[in-house]
Amino acid sequence: DAKKGHLFHPLILVMEGALIGVFVVLDLFVFYVFWELTLIPMFFLILVWGGDDRRYASMKFFIYTFTASVLMLIGILVMYFHTDPLIVIDGGVSKELGSLTGHHFDLVSMTAQASGNGLIPGEGLRHFVWLLLLIGFATKMPSVPVHTWLPDAHVQAPTAGSMLLAGVMLKMGAYGFLRIAVTIFPESTVV
C-alpha cells in the first residue's frame, strides 16, 4: 500500500477540481468532460483503497455510471446537432457562435433557443432526449431504480472518497438535471 499511497491525494485533487468544473462551466461539452473526470478518480479510489469487496463495488460503480454517461452523451450530441449557430444575445445583438459545423455547446444559448422556438423540433424527440438526460442524472443522484450501485460504493470506498461521494458527487446529478434538463426542456419536465 505504501507504493500506491502517493496516488491517493492526487486522485482526490483531480476529483475535487472536476467537481468544481461541473458546477461552474457554461459549455455542455466541457460539463460532460468534467462529469466523466469525476468518475475516474472515484473508481480508482474505491478499487485501490476500498474495503474487502472493493473490486465488485468499483466495477458496479463503473458499469452503472458509465452506462448512464453514454446515454447522457447521446442526448447531448442530439442537442448539439440541433443548435442554431445564429444566436440572439441580450439587447438584440446577434453574434455567430459555433465551430466549422455551425453548431455549439453553449448552455446559455441553448437555453435561449429552447425558450424561443425550441431547441429540438418534434415533441417526441424532445421527450426522448430529456429521458436520456434524466437517466444519466438520476443514476448519479441516485434515484430508484438506478441507485443500487450506491450502497456498495459507500461501504467499500475509503473515508475520504465516501465523504466526497455523499457530500458533493451525488449532488451533481440533481444540479445537472436542474441546470440542463429542466431549463432546456421545461415542457418535458412538466409532463
Predicted stretch roles:
Residues 71-147, 177-191:
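Juxtamembrane/interfacial segments at transmembrane-helix boundaries in multi-pass membrane proteins
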Residues 24, 62, 130-137, 164:
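Hydrophobic alpha-helical transmembrane segments of multi-pass small-molecule transporters/permeases
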Residues 161:
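Gly/Pro- and small hydrophobic-enriched strand-loop and loop-to-helix capping segments
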Residues 7, 28-30, 43, 80, ...:
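Intrinsic disorder/low-structure terminal segments
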Residues 1-70, 154, 158, 167-168, ...:
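Internal transmembrane alpha-helices of multipass membrane proteins
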Residues 38-39, 143, 174:
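Short active-site segment of divalent metal-dependent hydrolases/proteases
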